[in-house]
Amino acid sequence: MKLIVGMTGATGAPLGVALLQALREMPNVETHLVMSKWAKTTIELETPYSARDVAALADFSHNPADQAAIISSGSFRTDGMIVIPCSMKTLAGIRAGYADGLVGRAADVVLKEGRKLVLVPREMPLSTIHLENMLALSRMGVAMVPPMPAFYNHPETVDDIVHHVVARVLDQFGLEHPHARRWQGLPQARNFSQENE
C-alpha cells in the first residue's frame, strides 16, 4: 500500500506525527510525506520533534513547493491520501480545485483519480463556509474525520485521545492501530449477553 500524508499548519501536529509513527510500524505501507511551510512551524511548537525528525518517519519526504514531485501526477499510483491536520485554507483549496502547493496538488490528483482522500479538519468553532466546504467534499466522497475524543474510552492522557483519532483514520484504509480501543457495548449489555450464552 502507498499512502500520501499531508501535514498543514493547523494546530494538531501531534496527530500527524502519531499517524506517521503508526504507519512506520507497518512494513507493507509506503509513505510519502508533504509538510507545508507552516506545518513545520506548528510541529516545532506543539511537539518535541523537529521537522527533520518528522520527515524521517516517512519513507519519502517531498518539498511542499515541488509541483513536479512524483505524487503530483495521477500516473503515480497510490492508495490514497490523508491530510492531518487539515487547515481550513487547505480544505477550501481542495474543494475549489485550487492546487496551491504540493499538498493541494496531491489531494487534487487523488480526487481526480477517484482514490481515497481523508481529511482531519482542525478548527473550532466552524463557520458556515467551513461547513459548506466540508459538505461539498463529503458529497465528492472525501472522508471527514475530525479529531473528536471518544470519552467512552475514559482517556487519561492526550496520547490516549491522539491514538484514538489515528486509529479511526487508519480504519478508513482497513489498517489496524496497535493501541485502538474499540467500543464493546455497555457493560450491563455485555454481562446480559454473557449470561444468556
UniProtKB/Swiss-Prot annotation:
Keywords: Flavoprotein, FMN, Prenyltransferase, Transferase. InterPro entries: Flavin_trans-like, Flavoprotein, UbiX-like, UbiX_pad_YclB. The keyword Transferase applies. Pfam families: Flavoprotein (PF02441). GO terms for molecular function: carboxy-lyase activity; flavin prenyltransferase activity. Changing residue 37 to T: In strain: DEC 1a. Changing residue 70 to T: In strain: DEC 1a. It catalyses: dimethylallyl phosphate + FMNH2 = prenylated FMNH2 + phosphate. Its EC number is 2.5.1.129. It is an enzyme of class 2 (transferase). FMN binds at residues 9-11, 36, 87-90, 122. PANTHER family: FLAVIN PRENYLTRANSFERASE, FLAVIN PRENYLTRANSFERASE PAD1, MITOCHONDRIAL. NCBIfam families: PRK06029.1 (NF004685), ubiX_pad (TIGR00421), VdcB (NF041206). Belongs to the UbiX/PAD1 family. YclB subfamily. This is Probable UbiX-like flavin prenyltransferase. The gene is ecdB.
